Design a protein with these regions (language model features):
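PRY/SPRY (B30.2) beta-sandwich protein-interaction domains
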Residues: 1-198
Length: 198
């Protein structure tokens, strides 16, 4: 069963806006790469409107992953130019956006769940590792002018083995084909997530 339906549409990875070696599975919610040593990106299908948004990403295999947001206007040849991404090495990269990269000191690996909370009303993005806020991961509107652009999710991986590196849950309640273990609370009642939505 899926929560995604015509009256309740969730984001997926966008097969029309990706670099060439990205692999997709499970309704375009599992992302990986068949290549090694090249930067591979894919954006999400739906831009964030005015409101608060949350999604979860389970890391399922080594693959140099990073998760974040990118301006919706960019096509597959540009989505690496401006992006805000939390990388498995613990660094938040903000290439092309005029602020320095941020070292959080919090790495992640296979089995971890990385959540993203993006508040477009107040211009704040935060990352969580296994339901704990990542140190120094909060970026504000004054730094990146979130309110001046439309943004979509972005997934990055560089060293793939042909399997999914990231399994995203935008509200369907699944990581790949596995249901979330313990559905958290959600004030809007929209979607099923592993953890309580902050």
């Amino acid at each position: 069963n899926t929560e995604d339906c015509p009256s309740n549409v969730f984001v997926t990875a966008n097969p029309l806006n990706k670099t060439s070696n990205i692999l997709l599975a499970n309704g375009n919610c599992s992302v990986g790469t068949s290549n090694t040593g090249t930067d591979e990106y894919i954006s999400g299908t739906i831009a964030f409107g005015n409101g608060k948004y949350y999604w979860e990403n389970k890391i399922t295999s080594p693959g140099d992953p990073a998760i974040g947001i990118v301006p919706a206007e960019y096509n597959n040849n540009q989505i690496g130019n401006q992006r805000v991404m939390y990388h498995e090495n613990g660094t938040i990269y903000s290439d092309g956006l005029g602020i320095s990269s941020i070292s959080t000191g919090v790495t992640y690996t296979s089995g971890d769940i990385i959540s993203v909370a993006f508040d477009t009303e107040n211009g704040i993005i935060k990352w969580y590792k296994n339901n704990t806020l990542v140190n120094n991961s909060t970026i504000t509107n004054s730094q990146l002018e979130f309110s001046n652009k439309l943004w979509v999710p972005i997934f990055y991986c560089a060293n793939g083995n042909g399997t999914a590196t990231i399994q995203a849950n935008f509200g369907n309640g699944y990581f790949g084909t596995t249901a979330v273990a313990s559905a958290g609370t959600n004030a809007s009642g929209n979607g099923i997530f592993e953890y309580d939505v902050p």
